[in-house]
Amino acid sequence: MKIIIAPAKKMQVDTDSFDATTMPVYLKQTQKILTMMKQLTYSDLKMLWKCSDKLAQLNYERLQGLDLKYQLTPAIMAYVGIQYQYMAPDLMTEKQLAYIQEHLRILSGFYGVLRPFDGIVPYRLEMQAKLKIDNYNNLCQFWGAKLYQNLYKDNRAVVNLASKEYEKAVRPFLQEDDKMTTCIFGEIIDGKVKQKATPAKEARGEMVNFMALNQVKNTKELKSFDRLNYAYRADLSSADKMVFIKNELHK
């Protein structure tokens, strides 16, 4: 079983907490993307990144000196976001860290797919970015088949804790006997399940932590997840979707 999550836009260099023990699987492809990005003008990159002048300037300067093998931070510590805070890898035991290294995969527009202890550098490139690589019109097309092969090689089940932007890179390649179970963390509003961005990120991080703590081996075990006052709702779930609803009293 594999677990997929999305990266965070904000990143940091942290070479002290943990050592980077592995290298990204698709580093050759990442180097190709990096080379292409370095050939773009500042204006082209700003348009690609869809960000403010301040962020564009920061990332443009960072890009010019980017070295994929220097000052590496384990992926699990490199991303700074709500999901990663709630995952709390810095508080995990050796056994829990070994679990996420084996099962957790971070999907990335720049690196493709990452294990938690793959050594990476800060970058800015979302999966939805319209960067043409080889004969592909965008990163989703460029990475899609590679992500699928990586996730489903010798494995038929994936727990999807990623955002739709990243999930849709993999989904078109699913075969009939492949299973992707999406976890929805929501609340009932006007009789319908509504998933809000921030609470969902919190819950996804907690779910990864929960799975590592309990060494979860199959999706049935996820039904007991009750953190942040969520509870599994079988009546709202389906074969490929597990719905967790926040308790009315704790919204």
From Swiss-Prot:
Q: Which InterPro entries has this protein been placed in?
A: YaaA (IPR005583)
Q: What domain of life does the native source organism fall in?
A: Bacteria
Gene Ontology annotations of biological process type: response to hydroperoxide
| GO cellular component terms attached to this protein's record | cytosol
Q: Name one Pfam family in it.
A: H2O2_YaaD
**PANTHER family per record:** PEROXIDE STRESS RESISTANCE PROTEIN YAAA (PTHR30283:SF4), PEROXIDE STRESS RESPONSE PROTEIN YAAA (PTHR30283)
Instruction: Fetch the HAMAP family from UniProt.
Output: UPF0246
Q: Which family does it belong to?
A: Belongs to the UPF0246 family.
The molecule here is called UPF0246 protein PEPE_1842
